Amino acid sequence: MKTKEVVDDITMNRAITRITYEIIERNKELNQVVLAGIKTRGVHLAHRIQKRLAQLEQIDIPVAEIDTKPFRDDKKSQEADSTLIPVDITDRQVILIDDVLYTGRTIRAAIDNLVSHGRPSRVSLAVLVDRGHRELPIRTDYIGKNIPTSRTEEIIVEMTETDGQDRILIKGE
């Protein structure tokens, strides 16, 4: 299988910055926003967006860590839920953040987990990469890159926090 870099570190960081600016533009009350990163790389993205928001708007937005494994309908897991939500999300605007949007099943599981902890006033979705091929009616509100793929290809997001570098790869035939 071939692996090809399609987004380098500079372009990836620009996409994250663009998402941050869109969050600022679309959310009049940033103090009501909670960033909810989907483990693992979504949490890293949420922290990066949180840092940029602090630099641009001088506001400290809380970051939640959402574990989808106990809520998946396609992969059964016996692992305990390791979700960490540091604030009450009831009546808050929660932005779910993940690295790749594909079938939508991870996002559905994240929403199920989220609403088991409270009732947000609104839930929106930010992803670094939208690769298409939805199986559920889920759409993104904030998007870094649209990277169309075939079902046999795979998008790999590498981040400094876990992989030592920032880049996006396509793995396929």
Curated annotation (Swiss-Prot):
Enzyme class: transferase
GO molecular function list: RNA binding; uracil phosphoribosyltransferase activity
Gene3D superfamilies cross-referenced by the UniProt entry: 3.40.50.2020
Record's keyword annotation contains Ribonucleoprotein: no
Disulfide links within the chain: none
SUPFAM superfamilies per record: PRTase-like
Domain of life, source organism: Bacteria
Family note: Belongs to the purine/pyrimidine phosphoribosyltransferase family. PyrR subfamily.
The name this protein goes by in its record: Bifunctional protein PyrR
Species annotation: Streptococcus gordonii (strain Challis / ATCC 35105 / BCRC 15272 / CH1 / DL1 / V288)
Gene: pyrR
